[in-house]
Every structure is written in structure tokens, then in C-alpha cells.
């Protein structure tokens, strides 16, 4: 494994655990709760993170179709309930791409990490490694949001679910 990827693997592994716990004790109706207009629900955040994982896979040369027509790729969008996926579908997309990513990460070499990504990310260098670091941090940000929303729903936060049981 390339040395630059090792800390990213650690964070993505931790994120996998947090993401799995985000589904605990939630049904589809509860997960769609929005606490104010133009705010994210748990369902929206989970789908956004699954879409982001597909982007991470793309950075590594993995090919998977962008789920849900890319509706969850950027920023909260006005979507009707009939277009919002159910939790089990979101979990499956995350699981499939995450499994492929975790297998691919140890295979990455310096040349793979220095490739210019097809999308631009808010990083000082325009490389796959910088984009991978950004998207990993992006996951952590949204996992924090998920944890907070779970607590608003009177459910335990993600840290408590993963480490304090």
C-alpha cells in the first residue's frame, strides 16, 4: 500500500463503521424527517454519502453508475418523496462500492494518486490523492451531521453506537 493512502484507509474504515450504525433504529419515514426547510434529512445525507463513495471509486478507476441520476451528488435538492430511495437501497449502494474501494485502495501506486481527477475539488493540488483526502474529510463532516440529526430524533449518536455499547 502506498504510504500516502494508509491514513485514508484508516479513516474510511472508521467511516464504514459509523455509516453502518447510522441506520440503527430508523425506518424510512423517520429518516426522511427534516427539522427545517432546506435542511438535510438522514435519508438525503445517507444517499449523498453513497453518491460520494461512487466518486471516490471513480478516482481509483472503479466504474459504477452514479446512483439516483446524480440527484444527491451536490447540495440539497428539492426532490419529491417518490424519488427518494429507501434505506435498504442506499445501504446496498454504499456496501457494494465500499467493498470495491477497500479492495482497490491497497493496490494504488504513486501514478494512480497523481492523476488529475475529472472533477475539480477545493484542494491546493489537482490530484487524485488530494481529491481522495477531500472526499474522506467530506464524509466525516456529513457523518457528524447524521449523528446530530439522530440525536434530534431521540436516538443515540454515531460515536456512542460504535464505541460506547
Where are these regions (language model features)?
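Short, contiguous alpha-helical
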Residues: 9-13, 20, 30-76, 118-165
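Acidic/histidine-rich alpha-helical segments that form the ligand environment
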Residues: 78-118, 129-137
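Basic/polar N-terminal segments that are highly enriched at the extreme N-terminus
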Residues: 1-6, 165
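Hydrophobic alpha-helical core bundles mediating ligand binding, dimerization, or RNAP-core interactions
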Residues: 12, 16-19, 23, 94, ...
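Residues within well-ordered alpha-helical secondary structure of globular protein domains
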Residues: 25, 48-51, 96
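Surface-exposed helix-capping loop/turn segments at secondary-structure junctions
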Residues: 25-32, 103-115, 151-156
